[in-house]
């Protein structure tokens, strides 16, 4: 029997209908819903007299528009209407909802895993591009548009062309101070935002196997920034240990049986991929983006590039535009770039391990004068745990703002906006023009790098912090 990748196994297990030359009809095991991309989908059901086919395979929360201070006072009319619509729609169609009063509320891609809804072998969709986060568990997870949200609500299926397979193998061990965020930024920086276009990526190799589940989620979260349809990692003992005891995970003997099924999902020895990229983990350093897409990055000990060093006129023009928008000059050291804002949060880096890493840097320090620093936990459960562990107090003592759960400053869709022309060290996933607010200048970094930037008011190499004072 021909060896198969995990991608092939999950896909074949979910094909409901196939016709040559056309997309496959896939069954969907879990549909995650939030307030921004769902109102029109529910209205479409209502207009056509349809019900939600599987409310038991659907789970909703509110995250994008939610204020992270005074969360019950929503001043923006659009946000208020979207949140009210989600409450009404979930009531009417019988969908479970983690609303603002729920201790389970949070960013949809944080609560899915922590509640045990996300499991190996599942097909998972959500009206949000970073649904690929759930691929860390060996699930096939991808974002969909609003018309597709309606289709899944009505039928529990989705038409999809089968993408090609790309293996990205990270060999060896990461150096001190280098994180999962640096790995995915390095991949995109070296190979571009189009490297995964037309592919589903499977991340493999020793460095991946050594990562915790939360680190793996960071990697898979940003597969989309590499252009991929989805990204995933074959499940292993780390996966199973994380899921054991979670609210919606199987229990007792059923869990043991599930583990046997999940174990069989891993890509077979000798399975063929359409393309493979190999990277030596030891060559990766802490990363910082300097431009306006995630591939415009360099190591923290690097410099802002000169547009003239790029081969094509298209690239040169893109770099010139990016530098003008970001207010940077060619040849500037990354450590010279001043930072006025720091955001530790988002579906990329707002889990408990992210907050622990940031708190290690912050403990006993103070936020630099002129810097505003936010820590926004990814869920109310993460918030509670961080408070119990004393992390929240570490941040507060240093001068950080400690918030409720939500998408917050990742996107300019709620009150947490970065002012025009100011630089933000952000643990989020996108640095496009205007992403964090009109004219905001976003630099993508790891939680440790963001924490260090808050303390020093500029980027510093976290690898040096223990060895010698940087100020």
From Swiss-Prot:
- For this protein, what is the EC number? 4.2.1.33
The pathway to which it is assigned is:
Amino-acid biosynthesis; L-leucine biosynthesis; L-leucine from 3-methyl-2-oxobutanoate: step 2/4
Broad enzyme group: lyase
User: For this protein, what reaction is catalysed?
Assistant: (2R,3S)-3-isopropylmalate = (2S)-2-isopropylmalate
Where on this chain does [4Fe-4S] cluster bind?
347, 407, 410
Q: Which keywords belong to this entry?
A: 4Fe-4S, Amino-acid biosynthesis, Branched-chain amino acid biosynthesis, Iron, Iron-sulfur, Leucine biosynthesis, Lyase, Metal-binding
Q: Keyword Nucleus, does the record have it? A: no
Q: Matching HAMAP family, A to Z?
A: LeuC_type1
Similarity field: Belongs to the aconitase/IPM isomerase family. LeuC type 1 subfamily.
The record's note on quaternary structure and interaction partners says: Heterodimer of LeuC and LeuD.
* Entry function: Catalyzes the isomerization between 2-isopropylmalate and 3-isopropylmalate, via the formation of 2-isopropylmaleate.
Q: What is this protein called?
A: 3-isopropylmalate dehydratase large subunit
